[in-house]
Regions:
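Non-globular targeting/processing and membrane-anchoring segments
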Residues: 1-56, 76-86, 99-109, 123-188
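Residues immediately flanking
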Residues: 62, 92, 118
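Acidic, Ser/Thr-rich peripheral helices and adjacent loops at domain boundaries
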Residues: 108-118
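General small-molecule cofactor/ligand-binding pocket signal
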Residues: 88-90
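Structural microenvironment flanking redox-active thiols in thiol-disulfide oxidoreductases
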Residues: 92-98
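Conserved redox-active cysteine motifs that mediate thiol-disulfide chemistry
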Residues: 63-70
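Short glycine-rich or small-residue beta-strand-to-loop segments that form or flank ligand, phosphate
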Residues: 56-62
Length: 188
């Protein structure tokens, strides 16, 4: 795993979502369009509101990246619904040394999400796509047609991707909540 001091250092340089999008206003429109189409259900909002352990979530991204456009706003929606989630963003190429530690399938893919405890101990690393995203891409790309990188994905696929990301946030929250180390620290 990545040393907590490294994660803490990169996190300190990372940006909140809106500031990250402002780094390239010419590309922010695609992100905003996905954000406008994305809504959490009442059940999802309730689950996220119940989180009690603080988690630092660092997204290594590329504002130019189609997968980041399709998934990044979903991550932002999840974080908006829970005061326990501190979500920050870094550009893969700006933080190249850190990103090199997070290769997926041998490449510098994005988005990659680093989930860390309140003290920056790494709990999980996820990326670059959820299972629902891979299934959707396979349906569209493995055959006679090919998807355009910026094309809107079907609403049911987007909802499934949102739920899978939410599941990962929930999994990490339970990991943090049940951690003997953190339970001892918080006396619960």
């Amino acid at each position: 795993m990545i040393d907590r001091a490294v994660v803490e250092s990169v996190f300190a340089r990372a940006m909140p979502y809106e500031r990250y999008l402002a780094t390239d206003p010419s590309r922010a429109g695609g992100w905003q369009a996905v954000s406008d189409r994305t809504a959490l259900t009442e059940s999802q909002r309730g689950e996220l509101a119940s989180f009690t352990r603080r988690m630092h979530v660092l997204v290594v991204s590329g504002i130019w990246c189609g997968d980041c456009v399709q998934q990044g706003p979903l991550l932002a929606r999840i974080a908006e619904a829970s005061p326990a989630i501190d979500l920050r963003w870094v550009d893969r190429d700006v933080e190249a040394e850190f990103s090199a530690r997070l290769k997926v399938c041998g490449g510098g893919r994005v988005p990659v999400v680093v989930f860390a405890a309140e003290d920056f101990e790494v709990c999980a690393i996820a990326g670059d796509r959820t299972l629902a995203r891979y299934r959707g891409l396979a349906r569209r790309q493995l055959g006679p047609s090919c998807e355009l990188p910026w094309a809107e994905i079907p609403a049911d696929e987007s909802a499934a991707v949102l739920q899978e990301w939410l599941n990962e946030f929930e999994r990490v929250q339970w990991m943090l909540r049940l951690s003997p180390r953190l339970r001892q620290k918080h006396g619960d």
